[in-house]
Amino acid sequence: DNVAGVIFHTRIADANPGEPDAVPTLSNIEIWDTAIGVAILGLDDQGMKIDKLRIRQTLRQGLLVGKPVGHPLRAREGDTPGAADNKFSMIDVSDANMSFGTYAGIEIYTSQSKFEASTSWFNKRNQGKNALYEVKTRHVGAGWFIQGTRNMFIGCTAQENAGHGWLVEWGNNQFIGCLGESSSFQDAVTGAARGDEAANWYIGRNARGSRFVAPRSHNPYSWAKASLYGFYIENNIRDMHITTASAKDDRIGENNMIGRRVHVTGAMGDNVLIEVDHIRHATFAPKQLEKRGNGVFMG
């Protein structure tokens, strides 16, 4: 129950070398049937290049980047998550949370890392709908759980997970051309869990400063219960933009998408922009650049 496929926990203790980052690499590895697939935890596990990983059937997380709040090593290391400043490409995680705990396929607690062309799919959940909307458990069976800042996600996918597709809790992250598809998928849930419960995109109120460019939410199967919401956004969110987005559900059809395409739980703060299909909603009035002398425009 405690075996991981790969663990990095590098600490260059007080040596103050000219290059403080360990700069390890991890490439072209398949990992099946472990407690955790890959865990990158160390303060000096930085400057890494991680690519072409296939991780399947883990009891807990498939990929864990950084130490979560409450991790005993995090408490001993100045409450820092570690594992910052890394690059990930072509990561494929599926069938995580086989222990039916509260784990997501990919959990990110670090900062300033980049993820491209990566997928987290078919992760498990047996807890009911309430668990998806409680702070301590809402990442159960999710594709991606992001409790870090200043990260970038480019062309990544959450597909057919039993929980939410993307759960974005913290701010100043960027998402470009990413997909959330068929969350709370009926073939991935078990026990008290059901289809038609989760969101393809769940954006928490502390995700301020984040930008979502061309994100898609899609339930493509006419025969399958999948996500309840396309974009579920908590109240009091501020400084958050979703642009050129789309939310489709081929089972219920376009005329039944009210309250499901976009669902915001209450009032929003300043500088919020939501553009999903035909919806254009902003909590600010657009301003023009000011023309100054010599034909210069400033804003």
Task: Describe the role of every protein-language-model region.
Residues 1-4, 35-41, 59-65, 96-109, ...:
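Short glycine/acidic-rich loop motifs that flank beta-strands on beta-rich extracellular proteins
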Residues 1-25, 33-45, 65-72, 203, ...:
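Extracellular beta-strand-rich solenoid/capping regions of secreted or surface-exposed proteins
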Residues 10, 30, 42, 52-57, ...:
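Short, structured patches in soluble enzyme cores that scaffold and shape functional sites
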Residues 12, 44, 69, 112, ...:
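Flexible, active-site-proximal loop/turn residues at the rims of small-molecule/cofactor binding pockets
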Residues 17-26, 45-48, 77-88, 133-143, ...:
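Glycine-rich, flexible loop segments associated with nucleotide phosphate handling
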Residues 21-27, 47-53, 72-77, 83-93, ...:
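All-beta strand scaffolds that present successive hydrophobic residues in beta-strands
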Residues 30, 107, 234:
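Acidic-residue sensor for enzyme active/binding pockets
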Residues 47, 70-72, 164, 186:
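Juxtamembrane/interface motifs at transmembrane-helix termini
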